[in-house]
Amino acid sequence: MSGTFTENFIRARRDVIALDFMHLNDIQRQAVLTTEGPLLLLAGAGSGKTTVLINRIANLIKYGRGADTDELPAYATEQDLKFLEGYAKNPAPDHAERALNLCAVEPVEPWRIIAITFTNKAADELKARLERMLGTGADDVWAITFHSASVRILRRDIDRLGFDRSFTIYDTSDSQSLMKRILKELDMDDKTYPYRTVLNYISKAKDAMISAEAFYQSADKSGDIRKRHIGRAYMEYSNRMKASNALDFDDLILFAVKLLTENPDVLDYYQRRFRYVLIDEYQDTNNLQYLLASALAGGSNDGVPPRRQANICVVGDDDQ
């Protein structure tokens, strides 16, 4: 095929696919149609970032890589090119199926897409909007929070980390109650070591992937008495959580990251499953959430070589 034919076919195909997204502005539409590789979208509040995610998912399911690839159907002819050029100008409904067949390139099964957000409310809204746009085709998309995604991953393979798959999840109240008991038993004054402060130290350590033992040893080596006492509480907290087969909210993401980075076969399973990873409100991600998203997308993560190009789209507020 000539270079001119290929270029014209690619342009016509993209024009046809764009017809489904004419309700978006030019920048939003470009973001929706750019499907391959990493993509960062920064915009202010109320600019339609979530709308872009939803339409991007719709495009992936219907057209796959069609708008963002140089590949042509092996059977493409000049007649097909003329058809697409005409359809882009006058999209007749009775020709829609032929247009779809010429434009779709490896349309994505819904279960190969994961869209992660931060709150259950936001995840539920994402699911509802996807269902309104796609119908039952949206059911298998993982529209989910970081914590819920981690729970699903851990329920399948957490035994690799020495926990039972029926692990209990401690909420904030559970964690606080346990820490209060620990501090009392260790004779740590609650005015000098408020339980919330101790838990905050532990949370920051987990986000940096610093274990209780490493935290304590670092404090002991530096001679920081306060941190050494907090390290004792951290170790006792971790031991009791393990004995109870329990994980707190930080543990969910921490252990999901550990599971993926320490078990190449588990990592490979999820990287093969999820061809596309989308993250909402990216400006709110912490270190562990970044590591989890990177691992799922196939990016380099803690020395683990990427299995493939990372098809990850993140949207964030540049004012936050």
Q: In which residue ranges do the predicted regions lie?
A:
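The DHp (HisKA) dimerization/phosphotransfer helix of two-component histidine kinases
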Residues: 59, 204, 208, 258-259, ...
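Conserved helicase/translocase P-loop NTPase motor core
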Residues: 23, 80-83, 87-99, 146-150, ...
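ATP-hydrolysis module of ASCE/P-loop NTPase motor domains
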Residues: 35, 118, 137-141, 158-251, ...
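P-loop NTPase Walker
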Residues: 2-164, 169, 244, 268, ...
